[in-house]
Curated annotation (Swiss-Prot):
Swiss-Prot/TrEMBL site (Cleavage) positions: 99-100
Protein name in the entry: Fusion glycoprotein F0
InterPro entries (alphabetical): Fusion_F0_Paramyxovir
Residues spanning the signal sequence: 1-10
Keywords for the protein's UniProt record, in alphabetical order: Cleavage on pair of basic residues, Coiled coil, Disulfide bond, Fusion of virus membrane with host cell membrane, Fusion of virus membrane with host membrane, Glycoprotein, Host cell membrane, Host membrane, Membrane, Signal, Transmembrane, Transmembrane helix, Viral envelope protein, Viral penetration into host cytoplasm, Virion, Virus entry into host cell
Length: 537
């Protein structure tokens, strides 16, 4: 048994569209960032240097003073907010006490606070770790010498802990203890800590102005993480392809929820989205090549991106999307309806595809698709590099499709391209393609056309008002006009009737006189007739 499978290229008629210069250059899956998840990340700013404590005490003390200058203002703002946000356990008194979840803010103690700061303060209160969890976290970090570690709490929540300078201490300083003097080790660690402090200042500097509502991007946080951003994202469960999209869309954000001055660490609440692929939706990218009709250069106006799902075709707004490795990842829904005329255009009815003049802007003169060159050789120089012959395009042709059977090595617009076997027809003749209506996209042209249309509408309005006045005049004089017409008609009919009566009367009299007149030579035969009958005669 042989099963024949027919491969459907999609709902878009690429063959017909290619005749008017529309080429599909790329197709991507459609993914949306759904509701964000939250993960705690602890950034330990002071490395564990118990092995080399004697050599680095002075450098660590100086570094600690610098850290306090950054951490103390942030800690004061966080403490002020968390102390003045309390849980609202109940309302009312007695047996009929109503209980519900919520928080209440002591506005008098806070003083001036914006709506964003109050909202961030409530979120800070709800996401803040309790004192017991902080104490357990501090003890775990003091015993850890790993650059990246996972700390499991009693509630089974996993906290990712990062020690920014610990890798340098473990891999550079400790192995060099036998080869370098104690003073040199202290100097090297001091330089590293000073550099790390400048990175911290660049990351958390904005938080000094507004520690409550300030957000930190994961890109900025990567400096404080010691360049371990990929490992952190892998801990959050992102794949390699998704990782690039998440970073480009700045989907991962972090907020400071706690500062521990004694342990010298910061607790960050990281918000990261979940990617969800919309099955069946394919996003297509369209490119337009200009074509010539006589001396005028045109191109077809189509959206840059469209999406297909089954038989449906819709518009696609790429402003909130990032395109990476066969995927379009968007921070919101980017699909919206498409007009029926544009759908007919994409399904192959070229008469429904609008076109506009290439004026003042440089459009695509050629494009490489499926190994073939689709070019408007009437507006640019197309030359076969192998034979040094010019590839001409006659005026009755819209486009020229160049493949290896025409020329294997093509020089076009100063670029030399090696083409493959033929995938498109040789040429497209203007007489065989039904072109769509011409429109203007330039702002000045659109404004001029709109002004002309408005003027024509005003002129038409004046003419309509004049015609209405004429119709009103005719309507008012309808009875007098009818009377004037009926009067001569009635007189004429009366005269004709009298004339007919006279003619008929004369004709009747003439016939009657002929029927009663007796000829004088006529003598009746009265033989055998009685005298009385003769007398009667």
């Amino acid at each position: 048994m042989v099963i024949l499978v027919h491969c459907v290229m999609g709902q878009i008629h690429w063959t017909n569209l290619s005749t008017i210069g529309i080429i599909g250059t790329d197709s991507s899956h459609y993914k949306i960032m759904t509701r964000s998840s939250h993960q705690y990340l602890v950034l330990k700013l002071m490395p564990n240097v118990s092995i080399i404590d004697n050599c680095t005490k002075a450098e660590l003390d100086e570094y600690e003073k610098l850290l306090n200058s950054v951490l103390e203002p942030i800690n004061q703002a966080l403490t002020l907010m968390t102390k003045n946000v309390k849980s609202l356990q109940s309302l009312g008194s007695g047996r009929r006490q109503r209980r519900f979840a919520g928080v209440v803010i002591a506005g008098a103690a806070l003083g001036v606070a914006t709506a964003a700061q109050i909202t961030a303060g409530v979120a800070l209160y709800q996401s803040n770790l309790n004192a017991q969890a902080i104490q357990s976290l501090r003890a775990s970090l003091e015993q850890s010498n790993k650059a990246i570690d996972e700390v499991r709490q009693a509630s089974q929540n996993i906290i990712i802990a990062v020690q920014g300078v610990q890798d340098y201490v473990n891999n550079e300083i400790v192995p060099a203890l036998q080869h370098m003097s104690c003073e040199l080790i202290g100097q090297r660690l001091g330089l590293k800590l000073l550099r790390y402090y400048t990175e911290l200042l660049s990351v958390f500097g904005p938080s000094l102005r507004d520690p409550i509502s300030a957000e930190i991007s994961i890109q900025a946080l990567s400096y404080a993480l010691g360049g371990e951003i990929h490992k952190i994202l892998e801990k959050l469960g992102y794949s390699g392809n998704d990782m690039v999209a998440i970073l480009e869309t700045k989907g991962i954000r972090a907020k400071i929820t706690h500062v521990d001055l004694s342990g010298k660490f910061i607790v960050l609440s990281i918000s990261y989205p979940t990617l969800s692929e919309v099955k069946g939706v394919v996003v297509h990218r369209l490119e337009a090549v200009s074509y010539n009709i006589g001396s005028q250069e045109w191109y077809t106006t189509v959206p840059r991106y469209v999406a297909t799902n089954g038989y449906l075709i819709s518009n696609f707004d790429e402003s909130s999307c990032v395109f990476v490795s066969e995927s379009a990842i968007c921070s919101q829904n980017s699909l919206y309806p498409m007009s029926p005329i544009l759908q007919q255009c994409l399904r192959g009815e070229t008469a429904s595809c609008a076109r506009t003049l290439v004026s003042g802007t440089l459009g695509n003169k050629f494009i490489l698709s499926k190994g073939n060159i689709i070019a408007n050789c009437a507006s640019i120089l197309c030359k076969c590099h192998s034979t040094s012959k010019i590839i001409n395009q006659s005026p009755d042709k819209l486009l020229t499709f160049i493949a290896s059977d025409t020329c294997s090595l093509v020089e076009i617009d100063g670029v030399t391209i090696q083409v493959g076997s033929r995938q498109y027809p040789d040429v497209v003749y203007a007489s065989k393609v039904i072109l769509g209506p011409a429109i203007s996209l330039e702002r000045l042209d659109v404004g001029t056309n709109l002004g002309s249309a408005l003027k024509k509408l005003d002129d038409a309005k004046v003419l309509i008002e004049s015609s209405d006045q004429i119709l009103d005049t005719v309507k008012n004089s309808y009875l007098s006009l009818g009377t004037l017409i009926a009067l001569p008609v009635s007189i004429g009919l009366g005269l004709i009737l009298l004339l007919l009566i006279c003619c008929c009367k004369k004709r009747y009299q003439h016939l009657f006189s002929q029927s009663t007149k007796v000829a004088p030579v006529f003598k009746p035969d009265l033989t055998g007739t009685s005298k009385s009958y003769v007398r009667s005669l």
